[in-house]
A protein has these predicted regions:
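Conserved ABC transporter NBD signature motif
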Residues: 59-73, 112
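C-terminal coupling/interaction segments
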Residues: 250-286
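Catalytic Walker B motif of ABC-type/P-loop ATPase nucleotide-binding domains
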Residues: 146-150
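ABC transporter nucleotide-binding domain
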Residues: 165-178, 182-249
Length: 286
């Protein structure tokens, strides 16, 4: 068996003249959590669907658990898609029973948080409870690889933390995990990161590897709202973090010139760039 639970070799997917994924190579090994990052439309979901055999490649090859991504190998995988993959007109326990029968597995015990809603239709549950249900379904047959597409999107911070405890427990138990996320604090919990932009893999490794030589400055001024509007109107990339203004990949002199012309005084100082700022720079370059 291969040392990787997931593998893509120079994978490309085209839809007509549009290239959604362009010559991407990547791996996921047992026991590690790999974060797949990128803006909307970067190609993350298309790549995942090819890795799982749900979408054919135009070029290149994929492997799931050392073999083709067929039904036999998918039976050893757990998958939580963006839409959760649950039957909204069935109850929580009915969803679990259906999945257990499909995988010839025992019906799993419900976590305490779902015990009181076991007979509730999934469509009537809060989003956090739906995501917890999707996790229980995906883990019921003890998968060797777990693929999670935006698994915590739209849920509260406590629910996100609980779901990430589950993700880490799966990796600690030997499963390989591939997860997409828009939350940078979640990216920091991954063992390794992959960054996609415009269908291509543009960075991999640690957080520092992803950020690379991207630079950023912080702009401090009491009139933060006006400052943001001025910089935005000058086509300068701006990120607003509360009332703090950050500007990636821009000469401080350019920022000072735009603000001085509008009569705004501000303190401009270099700061360490973030993954989010690297993604913004890449999006503007394309």
């Amino acid at each position: 068996m291969s040392d990787e639970v997931l593998r893509a070799d120079s994978v490309t997917r085209r839809f007509g003249d549009f290239t959604a994924v362009d010559s991407v190579s990547m791996t996921v090994r047992p026991g590690e959590v790999v974060g797949l990052l990128g803006a909307n439309g970067a190609g993350k979901t298309t790549l995942i669907r090819m890795l799982l055999g749900l979408l054919a490649t135009t070029e290149g090859a994929v492997e799931l658990l050392g073999g083709p991504p067929d039904r036999t190998h998918r039976a050893r995988m757990g998958y939580v898609p963006q839409n959760l993959g649950l039957y909204r007109d069935l109850t929580v326990v009915e969803n679990l029973s259906f999945s257990a029968a499909a995988y010839d597995a025992a019906i799993p015990d419900l976590p305490a948080a779902l015990a009181d809603v076991r007979n509730t239709l999934v469509g009537d549950l809060a989003l956090g409870a739906q995501r917890q249900t999707a996790f229980v379904v995906a883990l019921a047959h003890h998968p060797e690889v777990l693929v999670l597409d935006e698994p915590t999107s739209g849920v509260d911070a406590l629910s996100r933390a609980e779901l990430w405890d589950t993700i880490r427990a799966q990796a600690d138990g030997g499963a390989g995990v591939l997860v997409t996320t828009h939350y940078m604090e979640e990216a920091q919990q991954c063992d390794r990161l992959l960054l996609m932009a415009g269908g291509r893999l543009v960075g991999s490794g640690s957080e520092d590897d992803i950020i690379g030589d991207t630079r950023a400055v912080a702009v401090h001024t009491p009139d933060w709202a006006r400052t943001f509007a001025i910089l935005n109107a000058a086509d300068i990339p701006v990120i607003l973090d509360g009332r703090a203004i950050r500007v990636p990949d821009t000469d401080p002199a350019t920022i000072d010139e735009a603000l001085s012309a509008a009569g705004v005084e501000a303190e401009i100082r270099p700061v360490r760039a973030t993954i989010e700022e690297r993604m913004l720079v890449l999006a503007r370059e394309r």
